[in-house]
Amino acid sequence: MTTHVKPIVLVGPAGVGKTTVGKKLANSLGLSFLDTDALFVKDHGPISEFFAVNGESAFRRLEEDYLSYALSSSGVIATGGGAILSEANRQALKVATVVYLKTDGTHMHKRLSQGTRPLLKN
C-alpha cells in the first residue's frame, strides 16, 4: 500500500538556500525535488529578463501556476523568494508542510552577490 505524502515546501527570502537544502532533503527522504524558479526559467528564460520586459506582476501570476503544478507532487518543492507574497499561493500552501528557512545577512549577501536577482536592482 502506497501512502501519499504531503509535499514539503521550502519558503524564505532569496539566497537563503531553498534549492540547496531542498535537493539534499529530497535525496535524504527519497522524494522528488522541484524548484518553481527552475521550472519558470525552463519555459520563459532568465527571471531577470522576464522581469525587465514583463514586470513583476506578470511574473507573480505565472509563479502561482508553477506553484500549483508543483503542489500536485508529493516531493520537496523550493519556491521563489517572493512566492508567499501572493494570497493565492498562501492558500494553496495549506495542503503542504511548509518550512521557512532563514540565515544571517552575511550568508545571504554572499549568495545573492553571485547572481542576477531582479528585485535586488530596485
Predicted regions and their residues:
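Phosphate-binding P-loop
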Residues: 1-5, 69-70
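Hydrophobic anchor at the beta1->P-loop junction of P-loop NTPases
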Residues: 10
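P-loop (Walker A) phosphate-binding loop of NTP-binding proteins
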Residues: 13
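Walker A/P-loop
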Residues: 19
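Short glycine/serine/threonine/alanine-rich loop segments
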Residues: 31
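ATP-dependent small-molecule kinase phosphotransfer cores
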Residues: 34, 38-92, 118
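A glycine- and Lys/Arg-enriched "phosphate-lid" helix/loop adjacent to the NTP-binding pocket
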Residues: 95-122
